Curated annotation (Swiss-Prot):
Catalytic activity: (4aS,6R)-4a-hydroxy-L-erythro-5,6,7,8-tetrahydrobiopterin = (6R)-L-erythro-6,7-dihydrobiopterin + H2O
Assigned protein family: Belongs to the pterin-4-alpha-carbinolamine dehydratase family.
Entry EC number(s): 4.2.1.96
A single GO molecular function term of this UniProt record: 4-alpha-hydroxytetrahydrobiopterin dehydratase activity
Name the UniProt record assigns to this protein: Putative pterin-4-alpha-carbinolamine dehydratase
Keywords: Lyase
SUPFAM superfamilies (UniProt xref): PCD-like
Listed Pfam families: Pterin_4a
CDD domains: PCD_DCoH_subfamily_b
Domain of life per record: Bacteria
NCBIfam families found in the cross-reference section: PRK00823.1-3 (NF002018), PRK00823.1-5 (NF002020)
Signal peptide: none
Taxonomic source organism: Bordetella avium (strain 197N)
Length: 108
């Protein structure tokens, strides 16, 4: 990563991100998305993967059928940064376009 990002307060980050939550054991954001079917979930992940490569910031995520669980943190900074907020906002937009329902449920 060429640019140094400063860690930000989780409450500030969460204020800009509806339905995202603080991870219970880490300095990270988390969210669960539910799609109509696997193809929609996989399409969402493919779109996010291209964006992640573009900004050189990659989510921790898992996919089970129509569900995608996401954790965002910036390892180099030891917590949440503007990169995570930017990724979360992009993910919310991409998920909405794919017809997803965002659920603020504990992921782990």
């Amino acid at each position: 990563m060429s640019q140094r990002y400063l860690r930000m307060d989780l409450s500030i980050a969460l204020g800009a991100l509806p339905q995202w939550q603080a991870h219970p054991t880490r300095q990270a954001l988390q969210k669960r998305y539910r799609f109509d079917h696997f193809n929609a979930a996989f399409g969402f992940m493919s779109r996010v993967a291209m964006f992640a490569e573009k900004i050189d910031h990659h989510p921790e995520w898992s996919n089970v059928y129509n569900r995608v669980d996401v954790v965002l943190t910036t390892h180099d900074a030891g917590g949440v940064t503007e990169l995570d907020v930017r990724m979360a906002q992009f993910m919310d937009e991409a998920a909405a376009q794919a017809g997803a329902t965002g659920l603020s449920l504990p992921v782990y």
